[in-house]
Amino acid sequence: MIQALLVIICLAVFPHQGSSIILESGNVNDYEVVYPQKVPALLKGGVQNPQPETKYEDTMRYEFQVNGEPVVLHLERNKGLFSEDYTETHYAPDGREITTSPPVQDHCYYHGYIQNEADSSAVISACDGLKGHFEHQGETYFIEPLKISNSEAHAIYKDENVENEDETPEICGVTETTWESDESIEKTSQLTNTPEQDRYLQDKKYIEFYVIVDNRMYRYYNNDKPAIKIRVYEMINAVNTKFRPLKIHIALIGLEIWSNKDKFEVKPAASVTLKSFGEWRETVLLPRKRNDNAQLLTGIDFNGNTVGRAYIGSLCKTNESVAIVQDYNRRISLVASTMTHELGHNLGIHHDKASCICIPGPCIMLKKRTAPAFQFSSCSIREYREYLLRDRPQCILNKPLSTDIVSPPICGNYFVEVGEECDCGSPQACQSACCNAATCQFKGAETECRVAKDDCDLPELCTGQSAECPTDSLQRNGHPCQNNQGYCYNRTCPTLTNQCITLLGPHFTVSPKGCFDLNMRGDDGSFCGMEDGTKIPCAAKDVKCGRLYCTEKNTMSCLIPPNPDGIMAEPGTKCGDGMVCSKGQCVDVQTAY
């Protein structure tokens, strides 16, 4: 039988109540003081409950007053906070990797709610007093112990009463140029789901989450690994709560501290660091420790006001299921909000627009924030559901705890169970290129999962280790294409003939060289470039990289496609054997790229 405790917290007269005080979260200018006193619940007959075998109870209740009104805070231990095979890694001074599997299941991190308030929630650490936050009557309150010798005093305060370390809004570094219009999103959301899609959306999703702490952050906290661990645990407990409305469970599968040095160069340019981190996860981390998503917590100050960056709609992709977050504030709630925001991007969620709302605010996916965020907006929930149905990411369907699986595995139910490597639904519904829908096993390595679109594309092959087809890759620039009529350039195969057909139609082709020799004149109609408004004539070797000339088939004309500024040969166009156009010159293809 699970033991329950009733703890009465009495509001006491405190000499500094309501004045400014320095807490772990920062300077707080208005607060209430309470003194928790544990009172064990009694069994029938007045007999006291026996002490539990574990250090921390599975459930607890706390009664106290907020603004003079009594409330009861119900807490349940977050049993799924750590994955069953959770590990911790740090490095010796000589660079030797040290990995352990510490006993973390008897932990002190809780979720909860205010009794008789349907929409309330709470995130509490009970390791050393009560620390965290709870929602009460639509407002968020924070609680933490006061550092007073031989005292059980705690402070309760609101976010608005904390003096910000920096008034500058925190900014997500994700730049979005592919926002759908409101109209297109609305049309998509109005489509009727099939029963199978509805079941898939309702199934609980699981993300095995790996956190890396870089060397700057390690040194900032005075090389104190236990303190860093507690900070990360509290963050993940908060992140876990924020994703519950989306039916996603976040389980920490690993924590790694770069205690000797960074494993790649962490730079102030967030986009560069994100790319490096994704490559490190793909080539170094995944071969030694499985995970669905990884985040880098860093002590570096990113350029501008950026505090985080992530790829959009990239969950389960080996080099893109990552995000980077700056540990920019002592307040755990702020950094945890950024971690949640960036993981939201990985789950296909864009930044909220002005029309997106959530209660209480601010919304998690706002691009700029100065306060902790606790709720996803209706826009975010809709985009997440659309991402699930569109991309069907496989890695979030397997439960991290094998003990939770009690029913026999069924191939085709979208749930990765014992004996299965993947599950993409029925063969008719499966949209995974590297999962065998009939066997629920990964397709073998070298199985083609994406055909080459043309000469300048490359086919993609399954890895045999994932249900996802690898990221689309291209032929290198300069690779011959279209029967040696051109050379690949940024996915295309530019040729003078194709340029004429595109501009004038299928009855046209490129003109003979005699027409291009006119480009040596450098007049209004024929030139290779411009400098300070003056047209520059072409050198003899560069004439095919200047003004474009086309000829109607079965004629001898030299036509210039109509354009006031002239149509020039496109960059990368073949201008001779082993030669391509670059900035109005015909250069060797080997040196051009």
UniProtKB/Swiss-Prot annotation:
Positions of the Disintegrin domain: 408-477
The protein's required cofactors: Zn(2+)
Annotated keywords: Calcium, Complement system impairing toxin, Disulfide bond, Fibrinogenolytic toxin, Glycoprotein, Hemostasis impairing toxin, Hydrolase, Metal-binding, Metalloprotease, Protease, Secreted, Signal, Toxin, Zinc
EC number assigned by the record: 3.4.24.-
Amino-acid positions noted as binding Ca(2+) 2 in the UniProt annotation, renumbered to this chain: I410, N413, F415, E417, E420, D423
Keyword Transcription part of the UniProt annotation: no
Sequence ranges assigned to domain Peptidase M12B in this UniProt record: 205-400
Gene Ontology cellular component list: extracellular region; plasma membrane
Binding site residues for Zn(2+): H341, H345, H351
Disulphide connectivity of cysteines: C316-C395, C356-C379, C358-C363, C422-C435, C424-C430, C434-C440, C449-C469, C456-C488, C481-C493, C500-C550, C515-C558, C528-C538, C545-C581, C575-C586
Pfam families cross-referenced by the UniProt entry: ADAM_CR (PF08516), Pep_M12B_propep (PF01562), Reprolysin (PF01421)
Binding locations of Ca(2+) 3: D457, L458, E460, D472
Glycosylation, residue list: N319, N490
GO biological process: proteolysis
Cofactor note: Binds 1 zinc ion per subunit.
Class in the EC hierarchy, top level: hydrolase
Subunit-structure text: Monomer.
Family according to the record: Belongs to the venom metalloproteinase (M12B) family. P-III subfamily. P-IIIa sub-subfamily.
Protein name: Zinc metalloproteinase-disintegrin-like atrase-B
Species: Naja atra
Origin organism lineage: Eukaryota, Metazoa, Chordata, Craniata, Vertebrata
